[in-house]
Amino acid sequence: VRLFQRTTRSQSLTDNGALFYERCLRALEEIRGAESQLETGKHQVSGRLRVAMPVLFGRQCIAPLLIELAQEHPGLELEMSFSDRIVDLVEEGFDMAVRNGTLADSAVLVARRLGVHRMVLCAAPDYLIKNGQPQSVDDLRQYTAINYTRAGRVLPWQLMDYDGTSRTFIPRSSLNMDDLQAICDAALAGHGIAWLPCWMVIKEIHQGNLVPLFKQAPDVRFDVHAVWQQTPHLPLRVRIAIDMLVKRLPAVMSLEFPASIKKPR
């Protein structure tokens, strides 16, 4: 039976070849499913787990949890990749990725929400003593902002007024940086107001090094997801990693001063 159609310039599958290829893919899926069931039956997590994640968020929040998981399961070989680009899980061979914000539609990927980022507007106490504390979003125009840039563009702040109205504020400043840690360091040094995720500033806030602003206003949150390639049989090592992150990640990202929860409209 002829499976390939060859010419001097190209090669393609015949109808029989395409049918054979599809059957082979199904057979491989059945084998993977059988392996997954064997793993589940033994309750042993083993094999290599490749996870992609954003650099700072991954380093501070995700990596410590996954390392603990690997220590609990000696048969698990953990490989973590830190990058702020959107990796191609299929082409680059990752088992799963952690992604922040809105996800693009995909026919080949599955997602599960792990938790939410809570964004915090904050500044150093010395800066606020010197310049006063803003009382509303409109007041921010009178203050120095420390901007986050991506691809040369200043990203706007998504804020909430006290009545829950969503506001998009584009800060104007001579301080523009494409690294969140550098922005946090500049805020700690008293150079202005910064809009940062709470997991990055929680310790500094509780130690009194940064002061959260607009605490009584509803806060803005962004979803965090785990994504993986769609498959009828998810390997046990991937499923256990996702379940662990769902259970433990929200506490890592929390901030303990009370506020209502509201998403931007």
Model-assigned labels for residue ranges:
Residues 1-13:
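A short LG(V/I)-centered, amphipathic sequence patch enriched
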Residues 12-40:
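Alpha-helical "hinge/linker" immediately C-terminal to small N-terminal DNA-binding modules
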Residues 22, 75, 199-203, 207, ...:
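C-terminal effector-binding regulatory domain of bacterial HTH transcription factors
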Residues 77-82, 147, 168-179, 217:
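Short beta-strand-to-loop elements that line the ligand-binding cleft
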Residues 107-119, 123-146:
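Flexible hinge/capping segments at coil-to-helix
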Residues 144-163:
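Secondary-structure junction motif
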Residues 184-209:
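A ligand-binding cleft/hinge motif common to bilobed small-molecule-binding domains
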